[in-house]
């Protein structure tokens, strides 16, 4: 699962295409606002995840160097950010995990990277199949917001149980849990605590992954300090299983 980068290819037309897909959702029994989503996230994030260095990091500048554009992107992201954060909270997972799709794909469900990572969570085929996604032929559950989120959070739940540390869990999501276990064994550790001691021997981009999540946490805690006005008044229709606009076609046995 790779971080979003310039070589990321899109099977669609980016944010405009995602916005059009959201417009196609059928009316639901209720709506939510941006306030609902951002309060849910900021209230559940660990305050320690935002350090002074994270707030001033190059990743923060990269993500929010044009505040007006970032605000518009947040509006488009809202239905998906709502679903991901709600499901993470429902499972009792650290809310930092709900920020992973921003790092992976900028919350774009049709993102495809070289080497196989696909969808909102940039899931590899073997991982997706292991967690119940149908991948093959014209069907690929990684393009479904709801299906891919269920699979990714199931994997993250396993990582959280395995490492009991959200930073190590995020590194394992990026580098693979077997690599993280090997790193801990080399250090003579049986349990991770990335606040005190980072696992060694990992790729630079894996360590950067944690820095990116920390930067986004800082933004969620205090967006105004970065010149961004959250779209709190934006109203949207929550995603539902039968309105997922990017779900694969149902298998009718044909």
Regions found by a protein language model. Give the residues of each.
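Substrate-binding/active-site groove segments that recognize
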Residues: 115-137, 149-156
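Bacterial N-terminal signal peptides
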Residues: 6-16
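An acidic, Gly/Ser/Thr/Pro-rich helix-cap/linker signature
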Residues: 19-92
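Short, functionally critical alpha-helical segments immediately adjacent to catalytic or ligand/cofactor-binding
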Residues: 93-109, 169-174
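Catalytic and binding regions of secreted/periplasmic enzymes and modules that target cell-wall glycans
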Residues: 156-186
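Glycine-rich, acidic and aromatic/proline-enriched surface loops and short helix-turn segments
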Residues: 106, 120-133, 175-179, 219
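Low-complexity, Gly/Ser/Thr/Pro-rich intrinsically disordered linker/tail segments
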Residues: 225-254
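Catalytic cores of secreted or luminal carbohydrate-active enzymes
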Residues: 206-231
């Amino acid at each position: 699962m790779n971080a979003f980068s310039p070589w990321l290819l899109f099977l669609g037309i980016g944010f405009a295409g995602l916005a059009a897909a959201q417009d196609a959702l059928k009316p639901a029994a209720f709506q939510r606002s941006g306030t609902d989503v951002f309060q849910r996230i900021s209230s559940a994030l660990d305050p320690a995840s935002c350090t002074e260095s994270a707030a001033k990091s190059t990743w923060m500048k990269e993500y929010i160097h044009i505040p007006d554009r970032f605000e518009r992107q947040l509006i488009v992201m809202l239905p998906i950010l709502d679903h991901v954060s709600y499901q993470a909270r429902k499972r009792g997972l650290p809310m930092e995990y709900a920020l992973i799709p921003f790092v992976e794909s900028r919350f774009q469900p049709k993102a495809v990277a070289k080497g196989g990572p696909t969808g909102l969570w940039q899931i590899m085929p073997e991982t997706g199949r292991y967690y119940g996604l149908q991948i093959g032929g014209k069907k690929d559950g990684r393009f479904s917001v709801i299906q891919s989120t269920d699979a990714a959070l199931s994997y993250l739940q396993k990582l959280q149980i395995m490492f009991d540390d959200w930073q190590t869990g995020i590194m394992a999501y990026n580098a693979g849990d077997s690599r993280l276990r090997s790193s801990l064994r080399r250090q003579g550790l049986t349990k991770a605590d990335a606040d005190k001691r980072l696992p060694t021997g990992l790729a630079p981009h894996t360590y950067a992954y944690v820095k990116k999540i920390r930067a986004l946490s800082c933004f969620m805690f205090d967006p105004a300090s970065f010149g961004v006005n959250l779209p709190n008044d934006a109203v949207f229709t929550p995603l539902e299983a039968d309105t997922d606009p990017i779900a694969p076609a149902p298998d009718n046995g044909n």
